[in-house]
UniProtKB/Swiss-Prot annotation:
UniProt KW keywords: Cell inner membrane, Cell membrane, Membrane, Transmembrane, Transmembrane helix
Protein source organism: Burkholderia thailandensis (strain ATCC 700388 / DSM 13276 / CCUG 48851 / CIP 106301 / E264)
Protein name: Inner membrane-spanning protein YciB
Protein's UniProt keywords contain Cell membrane: yes
Function: Plays a role in cell envelope biogenesis, maintenance of cell envelope integrity and membrane homeostasis.
Membrane topology: Multi-pass membrane protein
Protein family: Belongs to the YciB family.
PANTHER family according to UniProt: INNER MEMBRANE-SPANNING PROTEIN YCIB (PTHR36917:SF1), INTRACELLULAR SEPTATION PROTEIN A-RELATED (PTHR36917)
Gene Ontology annotations for the cellular component aspect, listed alphabetically: plasma membrane
InterPro entries (alphabetical): YciB
């Protein structure tokens, strides 16, 4: 259910794009992300840092898209967000000694420290690669193809990555 909730702004962006175009879709994505943060704050009294970062990036890049009437800003937004996540994971681990993946998943999984480190680096590399892939699609495909990639390609890549990660982690979870 959380996965669908996380996709909420992307799905609305996709639908609005198909109906009204990139600028309305951008406004819808900003509003949907604001609503998402408000709902989480109301329901849980605490909003995860990743969601705050997502809100900040969509407001800045979406706002620039709307104010300057230039779709390139919203197209760059996923790359900037993914790269911020990648840098955040690496910086938290090596500059501050905190493994954010372990912090997010540590209550559900018991893993040796080196495995947590590999998992953290794998997610950082994955986010970095998603950012590069987004740029490639922005530069080499149409706006409509980019929107399709944003929903289906990125979501598919995340699902495949999580499945592969689960298969890799299975050998460490035999006793659980």
């Amino acid at each position: 259910m959380k996965f669908l909730f996380d996709l909420f702004p992307i799905i609305l962006f996709f639908a609005a794009f198909k109906l009204w175009g990139i600028f309305t879709a951008t406004a819808v994505a900003i509003a949907a992300t604001l609503a998402q943060v408000a709902w989480v704050a109301f329901r849980h009294r605490k909003v995860d840092t990743m969601l705050w970062v997502s809100l900040g990036v969509i407001v800045v890049f979406g706002g620039a898209t709307l104010v300057l009437h230039d779709e390139k800003f919203i197209q760059w937004k996923p790359t900037v967000l993914y790269w911020l996540f990648a840098v955040g994971l690496v910086a938290a681990r090596y500059a501050f000694g905190k493994n954010l993946i372990e912090k997010m998943m540590g209550k559900q999984l018991t893993l040796p420290e080196p495995v947590w480190d590999k998992l953290n680096l794998a997610w950082a590399a994955f986010f970095a690669a998603l950012g590069v892939t987004n740029l490639y699609v922005v530069r080499n495909f149409t706006e409509s193809q980019w929107v399709n990639f944003k929903l289906f390609g990125t979501t598919g890549a995340i699902i495949v990555f999580v499945i592969l990660q689960s298969l890799w982690l299975a050998k460490y979870l035999k006793g659980e």
